[in-house]
Amino acid sequence: LYDYLQNGTELPEKPIVITFDDGYIDNYEDVLPILQSYNMQATIFMISDAINTDRFVSANQLQVMNAHGFTVESHTNHHRMLTFVDPSTWVDEIKGGKDTLEGFMGKPIKYLAYPGGFNNAEIQRITSESGFKMAFTVTPGTVKPSDNLYALPRLAIFQGDTPYLSFWLRLHCAPFIAYTWQLRDTLRDNGFTTLANLMLLF
């Protein structure tokens, strides 16, 4: 994806990038075997501080995943929603998380997913200066060559609440989905909570 956006490298037909955030143990126990059975790859955005803790993958499991179809990248150090915490913590969350994960993996960590997608221009600057090549949000949409490398959209699929029709709509109607989500957030931010909750968001 980076080579496509930065250098114009041709993509395969019907390209898709599959990502998983946080690093829960089911990524190792359930997702990895499924990916292997279909000869597919994915990226796991790992919370550095969660490695070797309850409900999350271990360092050894990350190494196995990295060797069998998963690219391991960063989801910050402690999974703090960056725009809601003291800016003095941003470097530790972004660069500190990268450094810690590189220590576990023994390889460069190039990409970041912001927790909750929350970011701003200063966070993007720190991300770039920390050595990341791209960073991802949860703003719904498909990636285009004109996109900001440090605020790339994704299509969120959540466990248990995404039936096939919703999944299909998110894939094929991303601009409309993005508009409805943004409208929902605007209504909620301006006190129209009930109306926001009534919106069909797919």
List PLM regions with ranges:
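Active-site beta->alpha N-cap acidic-glycine motif
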Residues: L1-H68
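Histidine-centered catalytic micro-motifs
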Residues: F20, T71-H79
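Glycine-enriched alpha-helix->loop->beta-strand junction motifs that scaffold or abut catalytic
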Residues: Y38-Q41, H68-V72, S128-A135
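Short beta-strand and adjacent tight-turn residues that come in two discontinuous sequence segments
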Residues: F45, H75, A135-T137
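Short, flexible active-site-adjacent loop segments at beta-strand->alpha-helix junctions, enriched
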Residues: S48-A50, T76-H78, A156
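Generic alpha-helical hydrophobic packing signal
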Residues: Q63-H68, H75, W90-V91, I126-E129
